[in-house]
Each structure stands twice: as C-alpha cells, then as structure tokens.
Amino acid sequence: MSGSSSQFSPGKLVPGAINFASGEIVMNEGREAKVISIKNTGDRPIQVGSHFHLFEVNSALVFFDEKGNEDKERKVAYGRRFDIPSGTAIRFEPGDKKEVSIIDLAGTREVWGVNGLVNGKLKK
C-alpha cells in the first residue's frame, strides 16, 4: 500500500469502533431518585453492581434513610438499585459511608435468587 489510501480512513468504522449518536445520553430518564447513605461496617471491601437488589446486599452494609436515620429493616432499599450506569458498581471499603442515589427496579419487578429474600414479584 502506498501513500494516502488507507482502509482506516476518517469516517470509516473499524473493528472495535464505537459510533455514538449525537447529543447527550440521559440515564434513567423520568425515574424518581432518592439519595441515601450506606456504611460498610465489615472488615472487608464490598462491591455492589448496578442492578443488584439493594435490600439483599451483604449484611455488613448499613442503610440510612433520606433523613440520616439508620434503617435496620432496609425499607428504603426494598425494590431499589443504584442509579448508576449498567455494568458499573460502587465499592465500599471497610468503614466507608457514602451518599448514593437509588431508583426503583423496573421491568417485571421480579427478584430471583440473590439471598432468597424475595424470590418473586416485588410487593410494592
């Protein structure tokens, strides 16, 4: 091959290329978010994925409602997940307390497996 002709010229897609739409991508548009706090009281890091049912996470994570009151029954977390991009996670080091945004699980609102606390359709 010589000179300026290349199979990888500007404007052509190449293997692995990502072609984004113009404008902004809005995540979870129209979904009501709540901001709560979560603290890791354990002695190991805990990482929670984007679509994990928060009600069923590791028991070393302590939840605080929007007013900062400890929520021992995890009512604030029932039927909710983190308001973060799909495939990402939030990591809590031992002793970490973080403010996080949470939203309702969508779709059929069924939770199966995890810690076996729901195993079916969510009640609310």
Swiss-Prot record:
Keywords (A to Z) from UniProt: Cytoplasm, Hydrolase
Source organism superkingdom: Bacteria
Keyword Hydrolase: yes
Localization in the cell: Cytoplasm
UniProt cross-references to InterPro entries, sorted A to Z: Urease_beta-like, Urease_betasu_sf, Urease_subunit
A single BP term in Gene Ontology: urea catabolic process
Pfam families in UniProt: Urease_beta
Reactions listed under catalytic activity: urea + 2 H2O + H(+) = hydrogencarbonate + 2 NH4(+)
Subunit structure: Heterotrimer of UreA (gamma), UreB (beta) and UreC (alpha) subunits. Three heterotrimers associate to form the active enzyme.
Family membership: Belongs to the urease beta subunit family.
Name the record gives this protein: Urease subunit beta
Encoding gene per record: ureB
